[in-house]
């Protein structure tokens, strides 16, 4: 079982698509895209993704990618 990273399509238009594509190439991560993740406040203020249900944010696409991997490393139990 892999960690699951979920993206909102609106947030992908802000640079999240770069992160999505990078993670999609990683066989150790499952990546999903949704029309909306119901986190409009976070989504409107910057880049974010849900990592196993937890909100992870970043100031730039590279920062978000780094924060996602850090979150997985710190919280993943499998």
UniProtKB/Swiss-Prot annotation:
Pfam families, A to Z: DUF1450
Which InterPro entries does the entry mention? DUF1450 (IPR009910), UPF0349 (IPR022916)
Tell me where on the tree of life, at the top rank, the source sits.
Bacteria
The record's comment on protein family reads: Belongs to the UPF0349 family.
* Name of this protein: UPF0349 protein Sca_0544
Q: Which organism is it from?
A: Staphylococcus carnosus (strain TM300)
